[in-house]
From Swiss-Prot:
GO terms for molecular function: bicarbonate channel activity; chloride channel activity; intracellularly calcium-gated chloride channel activity; ligand-gated channel activity; metal ion binding. It is found in: Cell membrane. Forms oligomers. InterPro entries: Bestrophin (IPR000615), Bestrophin-like (IPR021134). It is a multi-pass membrane protein. Keywords: Calcium, Cell membrane, Chloride, Chloride channel, Ion channel, Ion transport, Membrane, Metal-binding, Transmembrane, Transmembrane helix, Transport. The lineage of its organism: Eukaryota, Metazoa, Ecdysozoa, Nematoda, Chromadorea. The keyword Zinc-finger does not apply. Residues 1-31, 83-242, 293-450 are cytoplasmic. GO terms for biological process: gamma-aminobutyric acid secretion, neurotransmission; glutamate secretion; protein complex oligomerization; regulation of synaptic plasticity. This is Bestrophin homolog 1. Disulfide bonds: none annotated. It comes from Caenorhabditis elegans. The keyword Transmembrane helix applies. Ligand-gated anion channel that allows the movement of chloride monoatomic anions across cell membranes when activated by Calcium (Ca2+).
Length: 450
C-alpha cells in the first residue's frame, strides 16, 4: 500500500520530520533492519576474536590488515555510484506515475461528445469506458503480482464484470502462436473502444466528425500511456547497472567489517577510545544501505512493497469513476445567476477561524518600486544607441569613402541637438538591404560613441 504522511508535514516545525522517524510501515528501519543486524553480528564476532582469541603476532598482522583496508576504502566511489543511479531510478519512477492511467478525461470526453439520454447512448458510453479500463487490467495482470492474484485467469475478469462472455470468446479467437505466448493482445479492447466511437458517430450519437476525432484522440492517448507503462516493464534498466550498485555497496561494507575495527597499539600513545559499538560505522551503514533500499523499492513500483503503486485500488477507482461519468450525460445545473451577480465588490468570506490569518496576495517582486525622477521633467523616449534607427540618423549627415576609417569627425554632440526629433526618425523596410549594398557608407563599429 502507499504510505501517506503529508498530514504530518503540514508545518515546518523542528519536530515535524523527527516524528516521521517513528513510523514503521514503508520506513527505512523496516527496509534495512535485517542487513543491519547481520552486519553488527559479523562486526562483533571479528572484534571478539581479535581481542580474545588472537595471539600478539596475529594481532599485529590483523592490525596491519585493518590499516591497509581502511586507507583504501575510499577507492570505492560509493557516493557517485549511488547518487547517479538514484537520479535515474527516480526519473523512471516519475515517468511511470505520470503514465499509470487515470480514466477521467476519457469519461468526460465520452460524456460530452456521445450525447443522448437513450439506453443505446448510455451503452455506448459505458462500453467505451469498460473497454478502456480493460486495457489497463490486461497490462496490470502481466506486471503487478497484486493484480495477478486478483485476476488469475481471464474467466475471473469476466466474473468481476469487466468483460462479457461473448467478448471473452471473441478475445480468445485472436489466439495465435504469437499472441498467446507473448501476450500481445492488449490492443484488442482499445480497438473495440475505437470501433464503438465510429459506430456512435454512424448512428448519430456523435454530432460531428471533429467530435469523433477528439474522442478517438483521447482513447489513443489513454492507450499510449498504458503502453509506456508496459514498455518500461518490458525493458528495464540494463542488468549490469543495478548489479554494479548492489555489488559496490555490499562489498564496501564487507570490507568495512575489517577496515572499521578499532585497534589500539599498546606501544604507541594513542587517544582512541575502545568502544564496543561502532557508532559512526553504524550510521554510515544506515545511510548507504538505506539509499540502496530506496533504489530497490522505486526500481519496480508495481511490486508488493509498502510504498508500491496500488494497482487494484486504481482499477476500482477508474471503473467506478468512469461508469459514473458515463451515466450522467449533460448533467448540468439549471442556468441561474450566481450569488455575486449584482455585486460590484465581491464579498470574500472566510470561516471565523481563518478570517484573521493574513493573506499574502500575488504581485510582482518589483511592482511596488518607484523610480526617482529629476523634478517634474517628463521621461524622454528614444531609440537605443545601437539600434538601426540611431545608426541611420548618424549616417545621414555625411558619407565617407571606402578607405576612410576615422568616423569620429561626424559624431554628434551630447546636447539637445542630438535629442531633437527622435520620434521623427523612421526606418523603411529597405534600409538594411541598401546599407549592405551601398559601399559608400562606412558602418561604425562603436555606434554608442555618437
Amino acid at each position: 500500500m502507499t504510505i501517506n504522511y503529508h498530514k504530518e508535514i503540514m508545518t515546518s516545525h523542528p519536530w515535524t520530520f523527527f516524528l516521521l522517524l517513528f513510523k514503521w510501515k514503508g520506513s527505512i528501519w523496516k527496509a534495512v533492519y535485517m542487513e543491519t543486524i547481520i552486519f553488527l553480528i559479523c562486526y562483533g564476532i571479528i572484534s571478539v576474536i581479535y581481542k580474545t582469541a588472537m595471539g600478539e603476532s596475529s594481532q599485529r598482522t590483523f592490525e596491519s590488515l585493518v590499516r591497509y583496508f581502511d586507507k583504501r576504502l575510499s577507492y570505492i566511489p560509493l557516493e557517485f555510484v549511488l547518487g547517479f543511479f538514484v537520479t535515474t531510478v527516480v526519473n523512471r519512477w516519475t515517468k511511470l506515475y505520470q503514465t499509470i492511467g487515470f480514466i477521467d478525461n476519457v469519461g468526460l470526453m465520452a460524456n460530452c461528445y456521445i450525447r443522448g439520454a437513450t439506453e443505446k447512448a448510455r451503452i455506448y458510453r459505458r462500453n467505451i469506458m469498460r473497454y478502456c479500463e480493460l486495457v489497463q487490467i490486461l497490462v496490470f495482470r502481466d506486471m503487478s503480482m497484486r493484480t495477478r492474484r486478483r485476476f488469475p485467469t481471464m474467466e475471473t475478469v469476466v466474473a468481476a464484470g469487466f468483460m462479457n462472455k461473448h467478448e471473452l470468446e471473441l478475445y480468445n479467437s485472436y489466439d495465435t502462436k504469437y499472441n498467446s505466448k507473448l501476450g500481445t493482445k492488449y490492443w484488442i479492447p482499445a480497438n473495440w473502444a475505437l470501433c464503438m466511437t465510429y459506430k456512435a458517430r454512424k448512428d448519430g450519437y456523435i454530432e460531428s466528425d471533429y467530435f469523433k476525432a477528439q474522442m478517438e484522440g483521447e482513447i489513443r492517448t489513454w492507450r499510449t500511456n498504458i503502453e509506456w507503462v508496459c514498455n518500461y516493464d518490458w525493458v528495464p534498466l540494463p542488468l549490469m547497472y543495478p548489479q554494479l550498485v548492489c555489488l559496490a555497496v555490499n562489498l564496501y561494507f564487507l570490507v568495512s567489517i575489517i577496515a572499521r575495527q578499532l585497534v589500539i597499539e599498546k606501544h604507541k600513545m594513542v587517544d582512541e577510545v575502545d568502544v564496543y559499538f561502532p557508532v559512526m560505522t553504524f550510521l554510515q551503514f544506515i545511510f548507504y544501505m538505506g539509499w540502496l533500499k530506496v533504489i530497490d523499492v522505486m526500481l519496480n513500483p508495481f511490486g508488493e512493497d509498502d510504498d508500491d503503486f496500488e494497482t487494484n485500488a486504481l482499477i476500482d477507482r477508474n471503473i467506478t469513476m468512469g461508469l459514473m461519468i458515463a451515466d450522467n450525460p449533460m448533467s448540468t445545473p439549471e442556468l441561474r445567476k450566481d450569488p455575486f451577480y449584482d455585486e460590484v465588490d465581491v464579498p470574500l468570506l472566510y470561516s471565523e477561524e481563518s478570517s484573521n490569518i493574513p493573506n499574502h496576495h500575488y504581485h510582482g517582486s518589483v511592482s511596488e518600486v518607484r523610480l526617482e525622477q529629476k523634478g517634474n521633467a517628463p521621461v524622454m523616449m528614444m531609440p537605443h544607441s545601437q539600434s538601426a534607427a540611431n545608426l541611420r540618423r548618424m549616417m545621414s549627415f555625411k558619407s565617407v569613402d571606402e578607405d576612410e576609417k576615422d568616423i569620429n569627425a561626424f559624431s554628434m554632440s551630447h546636447d539637445d541637438a542630438r535629442m531633437r526629433n527622435w520620434r521623427e526618425v523612421s526606418l523603411d523596410s529597405s534600409f538594411l538591404a541598401d546599407l549592405n549594398e551601398n559601399k559608400e557608407w562606412k558602418i561604425p563599429t562603436n555606434p554608442q560613441k555618437f
